[in-house]
Amino acid sequence: GSEMCIRDRFQTLIDQAHNRGIRIMVDIVVNHAGYDTDFGDMIRSGDDIVSGSDQKDSLSNLPDFKTEDPAVSAQLVKWQTQWVKDFGIDYFRVDTVKHVENDTWAELKNALTEVDSDFKMIGEYAGGGYASNGNTLGTGEMDSDLDFDFNDQATNFVKGNISSVESFLTSRNSVLNNTYMTGQFLGSHDEDGFKKKLLDGGM
């Protein structure tokens, strides 16, 4: 059927990329499902929803997985790991990291490493950076987190605040190693980008 066709096309994409020395990163969401999906008891409801909680609230009213439940966590880890087993995906970009327990991330990383010892994950820990990442770096969870500080630092640099940026980079670089990395970005679908900040700032 159409699902098999999509799977075949996805496999062809990965195979052709690998033939050309290109690695494939896939975005995954473990915290929640899409609107109008039915995962039964895996989804938080009623008193299970804790308003204002990073990990037990329903983000934007999306169906929130009860990741604190070991059975739910294990199923989510199994699903994500199966993608790597089936298709040979190289990396994951992990959405909404702060909204899932650290134990789940450690379990996912362990499971993925059993499939591919070189597998890497970069996490989106909203608002985080090298000094603030919910202990997801250097702990066997994420290999890297997106650096939310970098956007501001790039803006500061262009505005001439070079010494403060140099100080930031020196501090950041002193803690980075192969289990504690940051991924730089200048904008995303969740926040204003570098260009918008500069234009709105009159530059």
Walk through the language-model features, giving the residues of each.
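Substrate-binding/active-site clefts of carbohydrate-active enzymes
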Residues: 1-3, 7-87, 107-116, 120-123, ...
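Active-site-proximal helices and loops of the catalytic beta/alpha 8
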Residues: 14, 18-22, 78-81, 85-91, ...
